């Protein structure tokens, strides 16, 4: 049975999303087919008041969810050294959680280290190694752009590996 997984890389300026479809083999020995359903970003302008930016994220994420109809959502967990960055991304994550709750969607969360480990086998891999692994796993000639969308696909793949 096909599963749709929506990966999200939350941010206020740019929220990356990447959706995959996964069709398991009939037995554990058979390979699993994983395909890209869609990927992209939701952007908000720094020129707009933060409340309006959060509304834009919320509305646009609803549209993405309605269009892609995921079975489960995978979200990258917060990990920042600067408090100001953490607060802004936490606000965006709150909007994400509200949208998921309104759609009654289950979600899983992964730290950046968990995503790196799942895709490269090494929890301290750099961003380019993870993005190359995404392209390889999804049989793409090029790394998906922008980076936030590639990161969201990495989170979706991590969820699939954990199922």
UniProtKB/Swiss-Prot annotation:
Residues annotated as binding Mg(2+) 1 are 9, 148
MF-aspect GO terms: crossover junction DNA endonuclease activity; DNA binding; magnesium ion binding
Q: Where in the cell is it found?
A: Cytoplasm
Q: Name one GO cellular component term.
A: Holliday junction resolvase complex
The chemistry this enzyme catalyses reads:
Endonucleolytic cleavage at a junction such as a reciprocal single-stranded crossover between two homologous DNA duplexes (Holliday junction)
Q: Which UniProt keywords apply?
A: Cytoplasm, DNA damage, DNA recombination, DNA repair, DNA-binding, Endonuclease, Hydrolase, Magnesium, Metal-binding, Nuclease
Amino-acid positions noted as binding Mg(2+) 2 in the UniProt annotation, renumbered to this chain: 76
GO terms of biological process kind: DNA recombination; DNA repair
Coiled-coil portions: none
How this chain assembles, per its entry, is: Homodimer which binds Holliday junction (HJ) DNA. The HJ becomes 2-fold symmetrical on binding to RuvC with unstacked arms; it has a different conformation from HJ DNA in complex with RuvA. In the full resolvosome a probable DNA-RuvA(4)-RuvB(12)-RuvC(2) complex forms which resolves the HJ.
Annotated function = The RuvA-RuvB-RuvC complex processes Holliday junction (HJ) DNA during genetic recombination and DNA repair. Endonuclease that resolves HJ intermediates. Cleaves cruciform DNA by making single-stranded nicks across the HJ at symmetrical positions within the homologous arms, yielding a 5'-phosphate and a 3'-hydroxyl group; requires a central core of homology in the junction. The consensus cleavage sequence is 5'-(A/T)TT(C/G)-3'. Cleavage occurs on the 3'-side of the TT dinucleotide at the point of strand exchange.
* Family in the record: Belongs to the RuvC family.
Q: What is this protein called?
A: Crossover junction endodeoxyribonuclease RuvC
Q: Which organism is it from?
A: Trichormus variabilis (strain ATCC 29413 / PCC 7937)
């Amino acid at each position: 049975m096909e599963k749709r997984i929506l990966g999200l890389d939350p941010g206020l300026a740019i929220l990356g999303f990447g959706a995959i479809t996964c069709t398991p083999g009939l037995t554990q020995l058979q390979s699993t087919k994983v395909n890209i359903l869609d990927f992209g970003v939701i952007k908000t302008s720094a020129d707009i008041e933060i409340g309006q930016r959060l509304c834009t994220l919320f509305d646009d994420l609803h549209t993405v969810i309605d269009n892609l109809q995921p079975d489960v959502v995978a979200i990258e967990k917060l990990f920042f050294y600067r408090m100001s960055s953490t607060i802004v991304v936490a606000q965006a994550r709150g909007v994400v959680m509200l949208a998921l709750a309104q759609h009654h969607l289950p979600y899983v969360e992964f730290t950046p280290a968990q995503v790196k480990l799942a895709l490269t086998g090494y929890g301290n891999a750099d961003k380019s190694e993870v993005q190359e692994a995404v392209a390889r796993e999804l049989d793409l000639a090029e790394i998906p752009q922008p980076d936030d969308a590639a990161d969201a696909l990495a989170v979706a793949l991590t969820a699939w590996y954990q199922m």
